[in-house]
């Protein structure tokens, strides 16, 4: 955690606790799930990523989203390891829409949200 809010640097690269991340990936593998590690550009804005999409792509990141920024800030404040388990809903870089998915895409998305994500949360919490 920064000593002063004045020390905050926007767009600072944050590295997760890889030992914790690898433990969570191991839990997923033991459960028969495949987790993909990805670089995430986190922004607290709900719309700025569209205006700045080309600039954000220069960060060579895999995902852009909003909520993880707050999650990692709180983990830093509480000095706790954390992992963002994300189910990707849309992709503004490729044009994959939030709506209009094929039946198979919707089935995979629903399975991730309704089965994999809750299972991983519970198993990760039990492992602590």
Identify what each model region corresponds to:
Residues 1-128:
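Glycine-rich phosphate- or other oxyanion-binding loops that anchor nucleotides, phosphorylated ligands
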């Amino acid at each position: 955690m920064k000593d002063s809010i004045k020390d905050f640097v926007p767009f600072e690269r944050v590295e997760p606790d890889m030992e914790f991340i690898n433990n969570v990936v191991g839990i997923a593998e033991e459960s028969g799930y495949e987790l993909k590690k990805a670089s995430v550009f986190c922004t607290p804005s709900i719309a700025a990523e569209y205006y700045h999409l080309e600039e954000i792509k220069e960060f060579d990141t895999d995902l852009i989203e909003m909520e993880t920024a707050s999650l990692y800030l709180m983990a830093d404040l509480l000095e706790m390891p954390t992992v963002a388990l994300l189910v990707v809903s849309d992709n503004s870089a490729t044009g994959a829409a939030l709506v209009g998915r094929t039946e198979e895409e919707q089935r995979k998305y629903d399975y991730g949200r309704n089965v994999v994500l809750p299972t991983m949360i519970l198993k990760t919490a039990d492992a602590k």
